[in-house]
Amino acid sequence: MSLHSTHNRNNSGDILDIPSSQNSSSLNALTHSSRLKLHLKSDMSECENDDPLLRSAGKVRDINRTYVISASRKTADMPLTPNPVGRLALQRRTTRNKESSLLVSELEDTTEKTAETRLTLQRRAKTDSAEKWKTAEIDSVKMTLNVGGETENNGVSKESRTNVRIVNNAKNSFVASSVPLDEDPQVIEMMADKKYKETFSAPSRANENVALKYSSNRPPIASLSQTEVVRSGHLTTKPTQSKLDIKVLGTGNLYHRSIGKEIAKTSNKFGSLEKRTPTKCTTEHKLTTKCSLPQLKSPAPSILKNRMSNLQVKQRPKSSFLANKQERSAENTILPEEETVVQNTSAGKDPLKVENSQVTVAVRVRPFTKREKIEKASQVVFMSGKEITVEHPDTKQVYNFIYDVSFWSFDECHPHYASQTTVYEKLAAPLLERAFEGFNTCLFAYGQTGSGKSYTMMGFSEEPGIIPRFCEDLFSQVARKQTQEVSYHIEMSFFEVYNEKIHDLLVCKDENGQRKQPLRVREHPVYGPYVEALSMNIVSSYADIQSWLELGNKQRATAATGMNDKSSRSHSVFTLVMTQTKTEFVEGEEHDHRITSRINLIDLAGSERCSTAHTNGDRLKEGVSINKSLLTLGKVISALSEQANQRSVFIPYRESVLTWLLKESLGGNSKTAMIATISPAASNIEETLSTLRYANQARLIVNIAKVNEDMNAKLIRELKAEIAKLKAAQRNSRNIDPERYRLCRQEITSLRMKLHQQERDMAEMQRVWKEKFEQAEKRKLQETKELQKAGIMFQMDNHLPNLVNLNEDPQLSEMLLYMIKEGTTTVGKYKPNSSHDIQLSGVLIADDHCTIKNFGGTVSIIPVGEAKTYVNGKHILEITVLRHGDRVILGGDHYFRFNHPVEVQKGKRPSGRDTPISEGPKDFEFAKNELLMAQRSQLEAEIKEAQLKAKEEMMQGIQIAKEMAQQELSSQKAAYESKIKALEAELREESQRKKMQEINNQKANHKIEELEKAKQHLEQEIYVNKKRLEMETLATKQALEDHSIRHARILEALETEKQKIAKEVQILQQNRNNRDKTFTVQTTWSSMKLSMMIQEANAISSKLKTYYVFGRHDISDKSSSDTSIRVRNLKLGISTFWSLEKFESKLAAMKELYESNGSNRGEDAFCDPEDEWEPDITDAPVSSLSRRRSRSLMKNRRISGCLHDIQVHPIKNLHSSHSSGLMDKSSTIYSNSAESFLPGICKELIGSSLDFFGQSYDEERTIADSLINSFLKIYNGLFAISKAHEEQDEESQDNLFSSDRAIQSLTIQTACAFEQLVVLMKHWLSDLLPCTNIARLEDELRQEVKKLGGYLQLFLQGCCLDISSMIKEAQKNAIQIVQQAVKYVGQLAVLKGSKLHFLENGNNKAASVQEEFMDAVCDGVGLGMKILLDSGLEKAKELQHELFRQCTKNEVTKEMKTNAMGLIRSLENIFAESKIKSFRRQVQEENFEYQDFKRMVNRAPEFLKLKHCLEKAIEIIISALKGCHSDINLLQTCVESIRNLASDFYSDFSVPSTSVGSYESRVTHIVHQELESLAKSLLFCFESEESPDLLKPWETYNQNTKEEHQQSKSSGIDGSKNKGVPKRVYELHGSSPAVSSEECTPSRIQWV
């Protein structure tokens, strides 16, 4: 079991390890000594491996301890039985440090020759309590404590064992036996102090291990006088078998025999405390106690209690220095101590301060509500101690649950009744103590709606909850603890999570005066998830927090005034950030360091009340959608509980905003507690059981909490440790090492420099703190003034009338108060520059809604225009006098109650217009029911009107279908008649030809004989043709008769349907006029709500100037009625239907869009790609319908439903040649000529894929190329399909996709290209570097692709329905999105350094590719290059600023800093010049071709590499300036890369040799030479700083260069030929972007 695994839970222990007065320990000396040894060894494990000079010091430190149990004899000499008097011989080492230890000061007369001093521990039994003890069965505690680096000369065997006897002195506790203080000064009394306890807590569940707890209310043991504890580094006992067996006797006998087994598995993963498992550790576990032991609390910020369970020591390899030292020393010689000071100063506090802690779970049972008492609800929840019992009323099954703490708030008369104070003291107060120690803490409340969560967390004014008590206690403790050495700074934030969106409750509008937009969650690589742009306000007193809390709660009420926005559906998160600044003195200097604690107090949303509405699943669906956070929270808790059982599972933190933000609180760095509130009533049994199971799983979560210290604390500890080393080395002059002494002094200097830098930063932060505090105060005043207009009053006048808000959530009712001043008070919509006295938000609130007049104590309300204003449920249209208690509803969703204090004082009774029911409470339910009753007739009229309109639309559809059928049959009849006429004309021609033949026969009698055979043949042919024509004529007439019969049937069926619907319409009209009771419509609150929602949707659509109209669509029959929402697009002439659930979700999106004043994603709120659109038949005359329009209307569901059983066969071409008969043609008249092209298309796609697979490596493209190719396929496919649709014949009966193989192929290719686009984009974007610009472009590209998919769906749906307007609109939007998306791809390709082969041979491609598409790609490349160069310039400025802040120690570092600054400026000039060149090429040159963009893309990786190398080189330089060791080879590599890349850029800047070009070329050459010189000088300075031997040559060089510089002033030349880097001076006339020296004049620039 490792430190981060589960601690033992104790059902009877106090929360968060509150100490028990019955517990004590007898393992302090044993476990502390072993722990101290592990700690000291782990502290130096890394530095000894890295620095061989410190290994000699490491051997002294590992062996050095103040006391060791007598090691003067070898193990073989030790007796096999313990000393009868119970003595343990301890040895105390000599020391030269007289200031570090009290024992050393008492024994100054001890000489250095004394190698050993006896020290004994004696155990005596108390005579007065002997009867209470049973026979002590002593099982020895055998454990292996192998000390690394020890040999036989230490007198300690590697298999040494310890024998510890533990007895019980009280019930259910372990008490160390008392030891009297002997007269011998070498004897130490081991007293059982209640403030120092160590206990084994009884496991509360099966399969849980026993953990050792360490508790202290005083400083840790290591910081006490050494006369109280044994600080032993070596333990010598008899060689027994390695077994840990602790047996405790007492009233509740508790046998722990599996401790060793569990501890042996432990591996401490913190602070390099990795330990090996002993070779043999056989134990067993027995639990016979009935009473559980209370857990202890350790307020000290350490992990001692976690380390107590780790009794194995990792053996350190022997060092050769230590071995040689031991060979030369005598057998019993022990090395002197050097680090007692270090132990006294730092051993008392564990610098790691990491603790494993499980989530503490508490359950609170609330009392019955008034409603439950009236209904006489039965109690099903009972409590006995910490056990909660639930009895199911139906199944009679009994459920038992045990938690850390159980609060019984059901009955105030109960002896264990838990009040608000009890809940805070037991659950929240320990969290506050842990927060002062530097841990993050979290407390969240969970339970169903109405179970008491908000009461527990916030409470009321007379009974405050956890949050107000926590804040008040926080500042009271801060006032007590704040001193000159310790100061406190506290910040707070308050936000809510509603519908997966975060709203800041402390800010009501943004900087532009608009409503604050939802915030986003980001994740920091170190500090974890955080809310971006969340306001953090500094608070200095509890009054500040009270005012901010009140403001936040009232803002929450303001946001929840809408009918659909329920506050019970949102989670509120209250966060405090406490920073403790502590001052310490090191060598007389004052240093500060900080400890930060983050406190989260969370009120989760209520769980779904689905069990009370089994018949309706809409409520449950809404809850699943809105409360996604609760569902994900359950998943996270379940996964974490499985992880606690050593299972590797995925934790879905990021599926919800709430769990993402609580990542550290659940399984991370936090001390977390949870309180689950439940109802005792039988009606809530299912929610109660669900909550208890939820809480039971949360108990298994293990957090790894650590103290949040800054770097100063670590630096101060290291500085003190180094100072202590030097003092010890000075006292021990015989073992002094000059090299080591010099290194220690150098390290102290480095640490002091770091510390001073940190202090400068902290001073700057202190100044920022003050500025933030002043800004917070100003912002609070501004928010108060703004919120007064929104009903948030902090000061109330008891004489003025007022309006108080009513809300469905009782927690938010009566939170807003609007004062009615003397005179006129105007009410209107909330706007940035609005002058209204009362400003309300909402779609149905008009700009000027109403006016309230208060004259002489009489208050009246006057509506303005058509604004919806209701008084006591009645819609008013004129001035109305308000009386005390009246209900005022504005806009349909703002509910208020009117209060008139003057009328109440005068004793006036409410007006007679109040109904008898109005004597009850005037709450939201009362006002809602009153409005519903008053508006019942209006709602009934709306519903009947909607049903009547639906019937009329159906009749209109049938009439259209009838007329369309009539047109189709008329066209068929005309076709048959024309065919008959053609056949008759052919028959007449044949008869005339026969007559002509007879005349010819008479004239040619002389040829009769010759033509006799021909005559017979012709007569036979004429007879056959005549018969054939007669048969065809007969068949045509028969077909005409059949169609006439079918036509008559169609007309008869349509007429019957028309008469049926006409009768229903007549009945509806009669019921509407006569108000017949036989036709009633049940009016419910949902109908009223739906009417308001439709009005809101139409108002939003009208104000945003969209073309969507929403209406109610009711279809009723004898059995049931179906209500849906019809959505019409007036621009495209199409309509669709939404379900009520979908309409509610879309309306929420519309509201959000309306509040944000519209955005580029506005279309998504009004339409959905999944919608099934159809042609709108409303107001569509039949005479205007073309063949294509008729074909699209036939696909309308309302029209096609009428003709479902009647099929009209199409008329085929009956033309036949003379050579073919009727039987040959009849087989093809009704055959389906369309064939399936799908297999062939798929075959071609597979072939093209194989061709791509077979391409050579030279033809490979990047992912960016593939993305652009996919966009190009979609781009061309849209144009081709749209063109084919336009060219289709208007009178064609075929669908666009039915017979055109090319269109089918294009459609499939477009769909495949989009799929490939999505897959490639996910891979490509996941590989991008983390950057603000890249992240923004990545989000925008994702959004564009999502919108493209939606418009492609609409485009194909329009093609299937033959709706031209829909096709054109979708194509236009999709083309715009494609062009914008390829711009983003071009920018990202440049920023990522990816090549674009697509631009190769761009001029040739432009002929076949759309020119707009190529221009979009090139525009993206140009923008990407601009962003890249700007980021390079910004990075150069950042590096200059960072380098400028560094201090220099000598001339070498000063020169190194100067050269580095010059190098940065040179590269900054490269970026600036490249930016100018790129812009000049794009703007000034007309022949800027695609090849230029290709070169631009190829340059991008070089700029990225140059930026990276510069950043890395400056980091190395800064590290060297700070005194840290750096890698010279890495710096050389970076500088060499910079020189090569700069050389390429300078060659690119060169121009042809002209008069101007030659001058620019010379300037470029000089600048290049300067960069080369700076690079070489920088490397030389760095080598000089890293190598101390080069200091003297550098000084010589520096002196020579100064002399040469003086000579160069007089002679004008530089004759330096000495060591070092030569200094070249170039003089140029004119201006140039170079760095000038001090001797430069305005007309001349000197280059060095």
Swiss-Prot record:
It comes from the Eukaryota. Residues 825-891 form the FHA domain. InterPro entries: 4HB_KIF14, FHA_dom, Kinesin_assoc, Kinesin_motor_CS, Kinesin_motor_dom, Kinesin_motor_dom_sf, P-loop_NTPase, SMAD_FHA_dom_sf. Residues 1633-1648 have a biased composition (Polar residues). GO terms for cellular component: cytoplasm; cytosol; Flemming body; kinesin complex; membrane; microtubule; midbody; nucleus. The modification Phosphothreonine is found at T277, T915. Residues 705-791, 922-1079, 1332-1348, 1468-1500 form a coiled coil. Its main location: nucleus. It is found in: Nucleus; Cytoplasm; Cytoplasm, Cytoskeleton, Spindle; Midbody. Microtubule motor protein that binds to microtubules with high affinity through each tubulin heterodimer and has an ATPase activity. Plays a role in many processes like cell division, cytokinesis and also in cell proliferation and apoptosis. During cytokinesis, targets to central spindle and midbody through its interaction with PRC1 and CIT respectively. Regulates cell growth through regulation of cell cycle progression and cytokinesis. This is Kinesin-like protein KIF14. It comes from Homo sapiens. The lineage of its organism: Eukaryota, Metazoa, Chordata, Craniata, Vertebrata.
